[in-house]
Amino acid sequence: MSRVCELTGKGVQTGNNVSHANNKTKRRFLPNLCQVTLISDALGQRFRLRVSAAALRSVEHRGGLDAFLLKSGENELSMRARLLRRQIAKKTAEAA
């Protein structure tokens, strides 16, 4: 299981621990990933995704999973999220 957010693509970054004496040692900055269940209003289903805490805040800010996926670009989404985005777009186009 990779340490990458399924919605934003946020992943592991590298950097240095810097001591008081300015000694530098390599370290990794891990994203704050959570297993969450998000509900799609258009599809009427629940989806379990591994997302970062920042992405979860963005989903709530944009008004839910459907709105977040439709507003986001496909290049930053995981394959599973891209499939969801296409299904939601198709369902909303049928309803309109």
Curated annotation (Swiss-Prot):
GO terms of molecular function: structural constituent of ribosome
This protein's UniProt keywords: Ribonucleoprotein, Ribosomal protein
Alphabetical GO biological process terms: translation
A cellular component annotation (GO) from this entry: cytosolic large ribosomal subunit
Coiled coil region boundaries: none
This protein's record includes keyword Ribonucleoprotein: yes
Pfam family, one: Ribosomal_L28
NCBIfam families (UniProt xref): L28 (TIGR00009)
Family assignment from sequence similarity: Belongs to the bacterial ribosomal protein bL28 family.
PANTHER family (UniProt xref): 39S RIBOSOMAL PROTEIN L28, MITOCHONDRIAL (PTHR13528), LARGE RIBOSOMAL SUBUNIT PROTEIN BL28M (PTHR13528:SF2)
Protein name: Large ribosomal subunit protein bL28
Upper lineage: Bacteria, Pseudomonadati, Pseudomonadota, Alphaproteobacteria, Hyphomicrobiales
